[in-house]
Amino acid sequence: MLYRELDRAFLTFAAIATFTGLLALSIIDGATHRVPRYITGLMIVSAVPLIVIDALVHVDITELLRGFAGAVALFLLYSLIGILSRGGFGRGDVMLSPSIGILLAYRGWDDLVRGTVYSFVLAGVLSAVMLALGQLGRRDHIAFVPYIAVGTLLAVLI
């Protein structure tokens, strides 16, 4: 009986931990252009065990493996972007990616792809608008974590 009431509670708690971290990081990144590692670390150590427990409760190891593969894939993508952008994409964003990758890929590959695309499209569109309005220069850096947060939230909710 209790099992049915808590059917996806562990996944829900993992999502809450992730979004709480994303909210804090969005505020910090927006104000300082810094992404503290201790918060990204807390996100990983709080969300990953809950996702593992959810996979064990539902006896579906393939979801868990997909989640870990998604964490690695997003980390590699963000790392590549960080290298190619020569500092335009921060290490904090790269270090945040496994937390987002495991949560979204655990839910499904489509969530991972949508969350990633939403993040970059939102950042691109809003940056273009700010450039057009003169609020942002071509060489200015933007805080990317808020876009990651909104993109991830949209992928989970839609």
Q: What is the predicted role of each segment?
A:
Residues 1-9:
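N-terminal transmembrane signal-anchor/hairpin module of polytopic inner-membrane proteins
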Residues 5, 83-84, 103, 132, ...:
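Alpha-helical structural context
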Residues 10-17, 39-42, 67-71, 143-147:
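Alpha-helical transmembrane segments
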Residues 18-24:
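Central hydrophobic cores of alpha-helical transmembrane segments in multi-pass inner-membrane proteins
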Residues 24-25, 30-124:
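Functional transmembrane core segments of multi-pass inner-membrane proteins
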Residues 48-55, 149-158:
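Hydrophobic alpha-helical transmembrane segments
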Residues 51, 123-127, 131, 156:
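Hydrophobic transmembrane alpha-helices of multi-pass small-molecule transporters
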Residues 128-154:
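Interfacial loop-to-transmembrane junctions
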